[in-house]
């Protein structure tokens, strides 16, 4: 049976289809990192302070955290091909708008459009892959295809900042927006050539039908919950009491509404009954926090506590990107998840211990090792959490579930940034890094215990 599945995997996923998925999925991570070197020239060119320019990064994160599951739900309602193409078109519009933007307001609008557009790629791609695999009768997840989708994010996270730096240096900051037009065109062309049209609907897509099946109230409450939660995280170490209260109230209202909704935005009842899926979201959030905290905190500590320049400190993140890619490749054709997840969570504990033992008076071996081990966490977490989701989610709900997985990852990455702010505060010290390390190690132990006790993993 396994041999038959292997032979049928190739025609189910031709190269043009895989290339379309790579470009569609890659739009999101490349836009998350490409602009990292642009806030300074933007603030100078538009005569705004640097703090306001960084809103361009926050705007995309907030939009994506909400738009990913929304795009997944839309893929299930109107079809993944339509959503995939619409997302690429939105990215092109956002790129043009940002490239010609005369002020910060237009730039923020551009980033919201880009965030919404890039959020369509991954959930739609997962639904497209699932439907193709189901049609071909594949008994196991198409692990190679899923690993490719995971590696796209890993590679672009690594190359995004230097690529953005080159674009800004040689073509100006507006090129980081204009590049979306070219990538959007390529995505649409590949999609038209390789993605089959969506099936015709039994019902007419009227406004009332659309609103009823999208669950607008559920979406609104979800958006309020996530927005308030991210504001709480981004305001740390100061706790925003108002946003904290809004988060709790909106979450309770969201759960209560979804439990009684005819077509819930998120099937809370099924999610509560499926502990494995819930644990997968939580584990992805924790492990991404453990990996991203190295990306955020280590360069900051190296620059402020060890007095390295930005160019040298950035080199310490290279092992992370290399190991993450190798780790993801190592399990590309292996559908097992239990052992890789246990290694992933154990590596997170090791990352925390390494950070807790690192000193500005010591050698560079420990921070370099911490970066490499964090790459192991990043690579294994991205690939295995995706495989677990593919196995656990019903075909008709995999779009929304894929979006929720991405939301979990966004919360983890923002949590990592907030953790750095809590322990570093106004002065970056060895003690702050040690506090971050201890916290990461404790969270890693919790993730490891949850993985060991999860008997659904294999």
For each feature predicted by the language model, list its residue ranges.
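Short, amphipathic, aromatic/basic-enriched membrane-interface segments that mark the entry/exit
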Residues: 75-82, 145-146, 207-218, 335-338
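Membrane-interface helix caps and helix-loop-helix hairpins in membrane proteins
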Residues: 104, 233-238, 333, 361
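Transmembrane-helix bundle of Major Facilitator Superfamily
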Residues: 2-199, 422, 426, 436-439
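Alpha-helical transmembrane segments of multipass membrane proteins
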Residues: 96-97, 166, 227, 231, ...
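Short hydrophobic alpha-helical membrane-anchoring segments
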Residues: 100, 188, 192-197, 231-235, ...
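Intrinsic disorder in cytosolic terminal tails and internal cytosolic loops
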Residues: 1-13, 201-208, 453-458
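12-transmembrane solute porter fold
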Residues: 13-31, 35-39, 50, 54-59, ...
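Hydrophobic transmembrane-helix bundles of small-molecule transporters
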Residues: 147, 153-155, 169-283, 290, ...
């Amino acid at each position: 049976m396994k041999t038959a599945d292997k032979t049928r995997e190739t025609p189910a996923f031709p190269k043009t289809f895989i290339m379309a998925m790579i470009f569609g999925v890659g739009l999101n991570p490349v836009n998350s990192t490409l602009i990292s070197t642009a806030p300074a020239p933007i603030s100078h060119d538009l005569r705004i302070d640097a703090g306001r320019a960084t809103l361009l990064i926050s705007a995309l994160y907030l939009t994506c955290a909400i738009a990913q599951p929304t795009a997944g739900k839309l893929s299930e309602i109107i079809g993944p091909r339509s959503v995939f193409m619409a997302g690429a078109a939105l990215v092109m519009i956002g790129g043009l708008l940002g490239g010609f933007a005369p002020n910060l307001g237009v730039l923020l609008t551009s980033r919201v459009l880009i965030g919404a557009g890039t959020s369509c790629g991954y959930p739609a791609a997962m639904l497209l892959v699932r439907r193709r695999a189901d049609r071909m009768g594949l008994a196991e997840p198409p692990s190679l295809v899923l690993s490719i989708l995971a590696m796209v994010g890993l590679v672009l996270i690594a190359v995004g900042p230097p690529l953005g730096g080159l674009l800004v240096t040689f073509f100006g900051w507006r090129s980081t927006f204009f590049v979306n037009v070219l990538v959007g065109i390529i995505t649409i062309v590949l999609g038209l050539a390789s993605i089959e049209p969506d099936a015709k609907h039994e019902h007419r897509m009227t406004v009332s039908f659309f609103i009823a099946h999208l669950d607008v109230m559920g979406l609104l409450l979800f958006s309020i919950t996530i927005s308030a939660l991210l504001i709480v995280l981004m305001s740390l170490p100061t706790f925003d009491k108002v946003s904290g209260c809004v988060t709790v109230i909106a979450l309770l209202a969201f759960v209560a509404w979804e439990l009684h909704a005819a077509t819930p935005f998120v099937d809370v009842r099924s999610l509560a009954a499926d502990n494995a899926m819930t644990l997968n979201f939580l584990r992805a959030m924790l492990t991404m926090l453990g990996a991203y905290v190295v990306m955020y905190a280590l360069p900051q500590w190296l620059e402020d506590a060890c007095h390295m320049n930005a160019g040298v400190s950035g080199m310490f993140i290279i092992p992370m990107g290399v190991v993450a890619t190798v780790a993801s490749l190592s399990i590309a054709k292996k559908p097992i998840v239990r052992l890789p997840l246990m290694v992933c969570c154990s590596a997170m504990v090791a990352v925390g211990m390494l950070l807790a033992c690192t000193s500005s008076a010591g050698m560079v071996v420990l921070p370099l090792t911490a970066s490499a081990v964090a790459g192991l966490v990043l690579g294994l977490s991205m690939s295995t959490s995706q495989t677990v989701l593919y196995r656990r989610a019903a075909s008709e709900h995999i779009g929304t579930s894929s979006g929720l997985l991405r939301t979990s990852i966004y919360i983890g990455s923002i949590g990592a940034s907030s953790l750095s702010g809590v322990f570093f505060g106004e002065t970056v010290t060895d003690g702050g890094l040690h506090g971050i390390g201890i916290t990461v190690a404790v969270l890693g132990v919790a993730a490891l215990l949850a993985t060991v006790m999860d008997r659904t993993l294999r």
